Every structure is written in structure tokens, then in C-alpha cells.
Amino acid sequence: MMKWTNIAKMALLTGAAGVVLAAAGCGGDQAASSAAESGKKVVKVAHTAYYFPYDFVDDNNKSDGLEVAVMKEVEKKLPQYEFQYVPTSDDDLLIGVESGKYDIGTKGIWKTPAREKKYIFPKNNIGASVIGVTIRSEDANTIKNLDDFAKAGKKLVPIAPQNAQYQVVTDYNAAHPDYPIALEASENFEIADAYSWVLEGRYDGYFAIELSYQKNVTAKDAPYGQFKDKLTYFRYKALPTYALVNKKETKLAEEVDQALGELKKEGKIAELEKKYFGEELDLLLDKQ
């Protein structure tokens, strides 16, 4: 199992993104040359450089993470291709896959109607992420799940409409018209003060992936580590994460999807989930 205490270390890669991308550029030239010699088609696979443990760059400047590891297993099943792994930013990945700069992208992404208009989503997911709510520890005895939160009339930190989490809450409200959660739209995708707002009582909960809570509250040297006794987290559900494929690469998308399906049946994805997360994330999906 990958150590969560390494999250802070991986976050430092954000500041070194320029160095990482420069190194990736050199590697890209070498990969293209190698593929040309072997007759294989190069597939550019972009991934976020610092989203530990999904997609990141390790201490040796090598692409790593659950989704990268799964894609490397996919590559083994597709000998006609040579995958070139390119660490990059979220924005460059999304724009790059849409424009064709990259063929595939991985960033722990969920499927939404808006995204399906821009990218091909393989039928088989590549992983999963757990989403839930950070609340004050003093509320933990009465609020144990999202239904409790909603029925108590608690307020969530605002969520940007373009954030997939906004759709998750919208779907919850549609399924629970008798006690919907008040959903306030934010102009900003990331809310830097979210944990502070919960601590202060300005809002009662922060709806985010479990990884965010671990990185910001429970990990070693976490920004809000001094408040870990005042905050707690409950899970709502797990959502499948997918590889994004450029809209024109229909054949590639079908081949990747088939490979992912085979890896699931073989138990390889479950094995990698245990390695990077310590549990089988797909089992959480089955419980929903």
C-alpha cells in the first residue's frame, strides 16, 4: 500500500512542474524515435503530475500512480502501440486531449454529460474515487451520512457548477425531494478556505473526495493537521474514474476499453488498487 504520508511530498511536484514537463519533452522525442524504429504507433498518454496516488511523478521523474499503472498494463495488451506518458497540468490535459495534442488523458476524472460531448469515455472505468463530506467532529454523533446532513438542514461549502461534485449533489437532491441539500454555486472551482469555513461554522460541511481530506487534514505535515481532532469525514459513495480519449480516436478507445475489461476479469486492476490504496475501490462501487 502506498503511504498517505507521502502526499505532502508529492504535492511539492506542483512547484516543479516546469522541470517535470521539460524532462517529459525529452522523453517524448526518444519514445517517438523508438516507436519509428519498431513500427509501432505512438500514443500520447497525458496524466496529472501531482495527483497522488492516482497520477504523479516519482522521485526518479518516472510516471507513476494507480491510473498510470493501469495504462501500462493496457499497453502490454496492445503491442501495436507504444504509449508515451506525459505528466502535465489539469488544464493542459483536458485541452490537450480535446484538441488532439494527447490521445489519452488520466486525472481521476468522473463522467459527466458535458465531458461526454468533448471526449470518448471507455465503457470500463480505470479506477474509482470516494466522495463524502468533511464536518466538525462535534457533529459526528448526530451526522453519520448524507441523509443525516440533509435532514438536519446543514449547509455545504459552495460548489462550482462545472465541478462534477455539483452534479452529484444535484442528483442526490433529485432523489430526495423531501429533504434536499441547499446547493450554493461558487464562482471558483477550488475553494482554498473550505476547511477554515467549516471550522469557523460559516458552513457545516465540505463536499469533496476523500483524498482531499486525507491530504489536507490527516497526512503528515498537512495544512490543517493541527485541526484533525476538530474535523472528521464520512463517505457518501464511490464514483468510477475514467481515461479520456480524443474524439477522433474511436478505434483506440475501443481497444483500450477491451483491454480494461480483460484486466478487470484477470483481477489486475483490483491488485493495483490494493497496492496504491490498500483496498479494492471497485468493491465500493458495487455497494452503491
What are these regions (language model features)?
Residues 35-109:
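Extracytoplasmic small-molecule ligand-binding "clamshell" domains
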Residues 32, 81-84, 161-184, 258-288:
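Ligand-binding clefts/hinges and TM-proximal coupling segments of bilobed small-molecule sensing domains
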Residues 84-149:
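Acidic, polar ligand-binding/catalytic clefts
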Residues 49-52, 63-75, 132-190, 210-212:
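Bilobed "Venus flytrap"/periplasmic-binding protein-like clamshell domains
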Residues 108-118, 167-171, 199-237:
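A ligand-binding cleft/hinge motif common to bilobed small-molecule-binding domains
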Residues 84-95, 183-196, 200:
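Short helix-initiation/N-cap motifs at beta->coil->alpha
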